[in-house]
Each structure stands twice: as structure tokens, then as C-alpha cells.
Amino acid sequence: MVDIVDKALRMGEGHQLKKLENVAKAVNALEDEISALSDEDLKAQTPKFKQEIENGKSLDEIMPEAFATVREVSKRTLGQRHFDVQLMGGAALHWGNIAEMKTGEGKTLVATLPTYLNALEGKGVHVVTVNDYLASYQSELMGRIYRFLGMNVGCIITEQKPPERRKQYNADITYGTNNEFGFDYLRDNMAWEKADLVQRGHHYAIVDEVDSILIDEARTPLIISGPAEGDVTRWYRQFAKLVLKLTRDEDYDVDEKKKVVGILDPGITKVEDFLGIDNLYEPANTALIGYLNNAIKAKELFLRDKDYVVTQGEVLIVDEHTGRILPGRRYNEGLHQAIEAKEGVEVKAENQTFATITLQNYFRMYDKLAGMTGTAETEAAEFMNTYKLGVLPIKTNKPMIRKDQDDLIYRTKKEKLAAIVKDVAKRHAEGQPVLLGTASVESSEVVSALLDVAKIPHQVLNAKQHEKEAAVVAVAGRKGAVTVATNMAGRGTDIMLGGNVEFLADAKLKSEGYSPEDTPEEYEKRWPGTLNEIKAQVKDEHEEVKELGGLYVLGTERHESRRIDNQLRGRSGRQGDPGESRFYLSLEDDLMRLFNTQLVAQVMARGMEEGQPIEAKSVTKGVRTAQKAVESRNYEIRKNVLKYDDVMNKQRTVIYSERQAVLKGEDIHKDILRFISDTVESYIKGANKGSEKPKDWDWEGLFKALNTVIPTKVDEDEVRKIVGGLKGAKAVEAVRDLIVEDARQQYGEMEETIGETGLRDLERRVVLAVLDRKWREHLYEMDYLKDGIGLRGMGQRDPLVEYQREGYQMYNSMIEAIKEETVQLLFHIDIKQVATTDDAVDEVEETAESADTIAVASGPDENGESVVEAAEGEVEEEDEDTDAKQAIAESAAASEAGESTLPVAGPAPVSHAEGKVPVSKRPKSEELKTPWADGRTFPGTGKNAPCPCGSGRKYKMCHGQNEA
């Protein structure tokens, strides 16, 4: 099916390429004219273009002259002239496409063309890279073009504070990583002051390594989280010890392909004995199952130096696609804590989601989106379906002459590694540079150790040595160089035969104390001479390495994705240089073992001798089949993630839009008055019990409940007399009007006390505080709903439709709760005892439980989803030798005493359903922990209805637990 879609997408490709060629011709026709301009005349082009846009000219009309201007400035500042194919790539990006350009074709330089053109509109252009280093490096190097033309260039990096970030976003052009852009969007929608906002819209973005960011990381929601209530870290330590006593295939099952585990009956018995409980599956022990599953996953599915590394007592995730460490990222739902417990490092507290968005929905917010990569064609259908992005392959400037050899397959990893070392030794002796690509940190260290034994000098580049990444890659093409690296996707620095001229020139100038930030004039002055000096040094070695066959890329195993393999291969053969590539495989490699058992069986049937490889087209084809199976599975996961996030995205868009309006000073006084009226009416309907006759209403309950929200001065007996002869809607309306009139009078007195401006500011703060808390609670409830929604399929119901329906109901309940709690807070602040408006605001903000956390997204779990947890503050160390049975006993004793120390699934959601007893005034957080400990039940209450005890929790999450 995907292949058919791919063919359909390619039907108009010839016409598109013709348009791109015409742009290149138009730019070339202007070259002599633009080249004749002085520096001052070139600088004057920018204000001229801006004026033309103001006068009504389109960017398309300006494009040829703007591109010609950028090309000329590039020649004068960088010594680089855009090739025709680069001009074509620039036009493709301007028109909102993905330009597929092979490695070494100068994608970074290509981006300067549409970036400058679109920045002329003054709305900001975002250039998205895969890491902070590339963002800084590209903004420095390419920034020389923009600054020459009078453009401001900004760069967003992790350590920056909000004022600095705002300055960078206000620049004409801003470089940064996908995570930084996404998290700044989320943080802007958590801000309490207009002055705290940093972004200024989403006009145009160019995404470098677009397949890595929009495909590989699309399964990864960006999530900002903060500490949840309660400390359950000891349970992770206990279960880390417990699973060491369990045996795989005897006590539990593991499915490595799907990344899931399952506890078996013998294992259940051992767990119950260890914990001293009768039944693991009793409702009171539900949370223990989660700790057990995570502990088994941490033991069996997440391996040190492959999926993560441990550095300075911290578990750091390794990006499966690039081999880079992902600082700040944490697996979700307790998995990261389970890994920390397994490794014996500090177990950090569990977190609660405050804000979240997928990369897919973040980048779909841009008015115009474009991307660059060397490997997008295999995912063309997904780019079009998800992002409405076409993929346009741009031909290489010079013909590709790299030799891609067929794969060699061995029986065992040991045989494969021996053959690899032998091959590398031969080529190193000849002086040919070699790049060995590995799939994990562990593999790179094994290969490095074998090269050490063989006395082959080499450099290692993996997640543990990422600081020296650019320096290592820049010299990987020199004569005799041997470089061992984890996945090369997105490394960003070209491997040039003889060495990377620009990098070496930049490094030389910086070593002499000159940089584009601190000494821009001296740096620019010395750049041409230094560049020519380095070029002369590199030229002879470049020719020598070409004679030796160019860069030899050796893949030590196939990756799940064909694109990652193609990116590794693409490091060789740039700009018409010679090169060669080959992959070495074994039947023990994960891809072969998990996804192509049929091929493994066929190879084994041949009766291979030890050390004897098979080299055949059928092997390469079989590997490709396995990769397609994995890619298809991952695509389905990404589609599923997007379908569910689209439900949240509609809600998030409305909530964030309303929040921004409040934050930016929109007058919400009329909204507050409406909230008062709606809340009062909701309470009246909840008290009438469906009866049209006021005499049957629960008047005592109505006024008791109402007074927890609005301390009304209306007399109950007087109201009953007035509405005595009315029925139905008229009775409801009459009662509502009486109470609302009284509430408005009280509210007017409040305004007289603190002034109109003071009350408007207070209203804004209260709405922000309540909206933020209710939105967080809603996110938790939606996660809870999604976790179990798949089971609806067993009842012949579409889980997605059910999620949409119930999510809509929960959203409406949240809106009602926001109205009610806003009114409640405003009427319960003692204005007379508040000296200033700021004091009142402080009182409100204390209820907001706001957090200032910076987090980034993590790799996918078995469902293809992941989150980020970034806990704020210190975590107290607990005694790791606490006996589990003692802990269970303590919990039971505490429960009898009216307390609870057993773990719970997470922070309890708070909601309000119309027509039920409304939420009472919110208790302090310590009172919320165990309201059901008194043992009461309320027969007849719906599981999802608010608990009648007034805690604000759903009944099933509160006193409903006592019915079990």
C-alpha cells in the first residue's frame, strides 16, 4: 500500500524539478549584475527587498534577486558559491517541501537562501537542528551571511534563561533544536506574566535532518513535568531486588520484539511470598503490579551502554538513532526509576505531567514548514499524510561513484568481529581512511577493544565521548584515520577526504583567540587568509586519499531503519569523491534474530563453516525485508500516537488560546460574572433531583453546598416563598437570579475595596491558577483513560471513538470545574485582611503549584510513546535495606490508623460533573492524600462521579476503594 502511495506522490516530480531549474537559471542570469555591486550596495539590498514586499511584491517575485544576493555574499564571507543544485534546493525549501540532498551536497549552505528570503517578511524564521552544537556552529558560520545583509541572528541553547531566549526569538533568524523550540512553546503556555513569554509566533521553519526529527522522534511526546505527591522511591528499590530472584521463561515471559513482559503463575507465587501478601491482584495491591512490570523491563529490555549509560551516578538515555546522550530525558511511567534502582543510583521522585505536545502537532502549527535530509524518499508517503510535505530529490552536483558492496553474513558475532578487524587492518595498512558504524555504545567499545588488541590506532565517538564529536568527524577522512562511531545520523560535520577545511580553519582562528561572537571584525578579516592556508595543506592529502579509494564505511550491523544505514553509507562518496561501503552481519544480530527468522533458518540450512561468510543478493534482500517490517510497525505506532494526540490537540489549542488571551490582558470581568451565573445554576440543577416542584428540592443541601463556593446572604426561607408558585425552568431561573444578584453585589463591594484595576489583575491571576491546575489534572485523567482504552476493542467498540467521546465529556467537566473553582477562590480571599493586591495575588499563586522545570523528550517505550520527567528539588535518601514485608506490614497498620503509605497509581484527578454534588472548597494537599481512610462507602454513587465526601476525587479513586 505504501509503495503505491509513493508512486502516486512521484507523478508530478518532473514538473516540480523543471520549476526548480527555472529558478536556478533566473538566479544565474543575475549573477554578473549582483557580482558588480559593492559591499555597501549589497547591504542595501535588504531594505530594498523589505520595501518591495511592503509595496505588494510577493516573495516568489523577489526570490531570484534575493538568492543571487545571498550567493554573492556567501562568496565574499565564506568563500563558497552556491551550485545550481543548491539553488534548486533553496527554491524547494521556500515552497514548503523537503529537499532530499545527499550527504556532502551542502544542505547547511542551501538553507541560507530560503531563510534570508522568508526573514524579509519580519515575522521570524526558525532553523531547526538536532543538537545545541550544530545550532551554535551553524548560527555562527551562516550568520556571517545574514549579518552582512543586516539581519539579526539568534540561537537557542539549553542553558539560556527566559530574557536571553526572548532576545534570540526576536531576531530575524533563530537557530535551535526541535526540543528547545517545542519546550519553549509549552513553557510559554505555563507563564504567569506576559513578560515571561519568549516566542513570537510560528511563521516559517526549516528542519535539518527532517526525517530524524519528524519521523524517528515523532513517537516521542514533549512533556514538561514536575514532582508528584508522595514518595514511593523505596518500592522501586525493593522490586529491583525482587526480580533478581525471578528466572526468565520460568517466572515471567519477555517479548523483545514488542518490548513487553508478562508475569507467570510461579513468578506470582514468589512475588507474593517475598512481599508477604495473599493476592497480588487484589485492588489494594494494583500499584505493585506496575512496579513489578517495570523492574522486569529494566532487567531484561533496557541494557546498560546500549539503551542508556550511567555517568556520575545518573542514568542517561542514549538516542537509538544517533547514539547521542539525551541529557534531561527520562522514560515514563516509572520505568526510569526502575532502571535507576537496578543500577543502584539515586532513585528520583515520580513526576506529574504539566504540559505536553507531540513533535507532529508542534511542527504542524507553522504557517510554512520545510525540511532537508539525505534520506527522505523512503518515508515520502508519511511526510505527505502527516505534514503535507512533498519530497523533492535534488540531483548531486557531481555523479555519485561510491561502491556499495553486498552484505557479508556470518554465523556468530565472534566470527563477524574477527572478519571486521582483519578488513580494517588491511585498509589501514594501505592508508585508506575507515569509518566503522556501530549500533550502540557497547558495540563501539567492543570493536575498539579488538582494534587495540590488533594495535590499530583509532578514535572512538559514542555517547560517552560526544563532547569531541565535531573534532573527531572533521579529521575522519584523513589518510590512515580509523574512526569507530555509533550511528552517524545527524552528526552534522562533513567527513572530507584530507580533512574538513572550514572546521580546521575555524578551530585555528579560535585557538588564536578570534571568534565571530567576541571579535567579529578580526575574525572576518583573518578568515580568508586562514581558509586558503588550510586549503593548501589539505589539498595534497585529499588527492592522495582519493587514489587510495576514498573513505571506506564499514557497518558492523544493520539498523532497524534503512534510512539510518543510508545515512551511514552517505558519509562516503561526497561531491563526486570515490568511496566504498559494506555491512557485516551475523545471525546473532538483533534485527536478524527478532525480525527475520526465516532468513536465519535458510542460512543455517546451508551448513556454513566457521568464519565463512555468505555474500549474496538474497541476503541483502532478506535484510531489507526485515527492515521494512520494522519500519511498517513503527509507522503504525506513529500514526496511532498522532490519532490520539489529535484529540488532545484540539483541546490544547482551545485552552492555550484562552490562556494566552488572559495572560495578555484581555478583560475577563464579563466572563467571571458568567462563571458565577453558570455555577449557581449548576448547583440548583444538582439539588432539584429532577423534580419540577421546588417543594421537592434539597434546599438544605443546596445552600450548604453553595456556601462552600459563594457565601450567599440570601435567606433560604425567603427564596422558597418567592418560588413557591413556580415550576421547572422558571423556578430554576428565579432562584438563580436571586442568588446571582446577591453574589454580584458582594463582588461589587470587593471591587470597591481593592479598586477596579486590582480586581481585574486578581481575576486574571485566579483564572490562570485554576486553569493550570485543572489542565494538569485533565492531562492525568486523559493519560489514565488512554492507558486502558485499548481494552474497549474486546467489547467490539472502537477504542479511538471511545477515547474521543469520553475525552470530550472529561473536557466539558474540566471547563465546569474551572468556572466553579475560579468563583470559589475569588469569593474566599479575605480582601479586608490583604494589605495590597500583590498579597492577594501571592495567596492565589500558592494554590497554583506551579513548577519551573526544563525537560526534554525521551525514547519510545513498548507502546511507541515516551515522556520526560524532570523533578524539581532534592530527593531525600531512604534506607535501601528496608524489608519489603515490613513495609507492607507498616502500610497495613497505617491503614488501620486512618493513614496510608501504600503506593497509589498517581496523583488523584479532581473533576466536577454537572448535576452531582459539586466540589467543596479545596482542602490542603496533605488532607487530600487519604480521604477514604475512614472506611465509609456511599452506595449508589457512580464510579466516575465526584465522591460525596467532598474531596473532589472521583468516587472510584476515593471512598469507592472501600467497596472492594
From Swiss-Prot:
Q: Where is this region: Disordered?
A: 846-964
Q: Which Pfam families does the UniProt entry name for this protein?
A: P-loop_SecA, SEC-C, SecA_DEAD, SecA_PP_bind, SecA_SW
Q: Where in the cell is it found?
A: Cell membrane; Cytoplasm
Broad class of enzyme this protein falls into? translocase
Q: Where is the composition biased (Low complexity)?
A: 887-900
GO CC: one term? cell envelope Sec protein transport complex
Organism lineage string: Bacteria, Bacillati, Actinomycetota, Actinomycetes, Bifidobacteriales
Protein name listed in UniProt = Protein translocase subunit SecA
Give the UniProt family note: Belongs to the SecA family.
Q: Give the GO molecular function terms.
A: ATP binding; metal ion binding; protein-exporting ATPase activity
Query: What PANTHER family does this protein's entry cite?
Result: CHLOROPLAST PROTEIN-TRANSPORTING ATPASE, SECA INNER MEMBRANE COMPONENT OF SEC PROTEIN SECRETION SYSTEM
Cofactor binding remark: May bind 1 zinc ion per subunit.
Please list the residue ranges that the record marks as compositionally biased, kind Acidic residues: 871-882
Q: Which UniProt keywords apply?
A: ATP-binding, Cell membrane, Cytoplasm, Membrane, Metal-binding, Nucleotide-binding, Protein transport, Translocase, Translocation, Transport, Zinc
